[in-house]
């Protein structure tokens, strides 16, 4: 919770984002996109809370998703609570439950 808003974050309390160009259960952020928007990666041994799942990326890795929406970090966020990626190019948004 930040400024009265509830949003998703990783274990280090960094803000997570969703990408409008993704489809449910499918990431469309690779190469240069994934450098700026690192996918939140997971593994098969992870204990996931309700609503979270793992999706397989075309590069073979497992990415954490919430309600089937792949989750990402933003390379310009420097500390917990930063939300500088919200609204970038009109297609990136803070992930919310």
How would you describe each model-predicted region?
Residues 1-97:
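Compact beta-sheet-dominated domain cores in extracellular/mature segments
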